[in-house]
From Swiss-Prot:
Keywords: Cell inner membrane, Cell membrane, Membrane, Protein transport, Translocation, Transmembrane, Transmembrane helix, Transport. It is found in: Cell inner membrane. It comes from Yersinia pestis. Residues 46-56 have a biased composition (Polar residues). GO terms for cellular component: TAT protein transport complex. The chain crosses the membrane at residues 1-21. The lineage of its organism: Bacteria, Pseudomonadati, Pseudomonadota, Gammaproteobacteria, Enterobacterales. This is Sec-independent protein translocase protein TatA. Gene3D superfamilies: 1.20.5.3310.
Length: 88
């Protein structure tokens, strides 16, 4: 008594076609298909993104290393200036 049979589904389908018309249902179906296709494409693009981020991370690490190497000579120069002030 709680389940819907094939006869009830057929009656519901006929009522929907009569209410909306075949053109409206065709447009609705194509819009739904395009939405699903766009969603799948977006999910596929998302899975391809992480490998490019890994490359950027390795470049960032090299960049940080070069910055620390450049800052070390500046720190040594400041130490020598402060050492000269203490002696002088």
């Amino acid at each position: 008594m709680g389940s819907i049979g094939w006869a009830q589904l057929l009656i519901i389908a006929v009522i929907v076609v009569l209410l909306f018309g075949t053109n409206k249902l065709r447009t609705l179906g194509s819009d739904l298909g395009a939405s699903i296709k766009g969603f799948k494409k977006a999910m596929g693009d998302d899975s391809q993104t992480p490998p490019t981020n890994v490359d950027k991370t390795s470049n960032d690490a090299d960049f940080a290393k070069s910055i620390t190497e450049k800052q070390q000579p500046v720190a040594k120069a400041e130490e020598s200036k402060s050492h000269e002030k203490e002696q002088g």
